[in-house]
């Protein structure tokens, strides 16, 4: 099985490091909208947003991966909306969107067991561009099944709130 299914990556910054996600997972890039908090959620779950009629949890990758424990949210904060393998929409808070990269499969490497600030189970692999390495995140593993189910149940309540206000 190939490390990635798409030969294009959307790259973004978390702290000083560059990361990538497969472009075929990306649905939209938006500035930080109104986020409805979810009670008792993990501290890296900022809440949920209404994204074109679909309620999506918002995950701050900076907090999730201990890159920034006290981030600031402004109207310039970026969310990348992505679809997971099971077709659920989630929003990922990042520091900045960088570029779209065409992946040369000869420069693609499996995820290392160490050497990155993010645990290897969240990685698809590495892509070497010139002299730097871009860490490719595995979107489908950022939330495990239990976390996704818990967020889905909590989001159902938010769906009712969004529906009532429409």
Where are these regions (language model features)?
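An acidic, low-aromatic, low-complexity terminal/linker signal
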Residues: 1-166
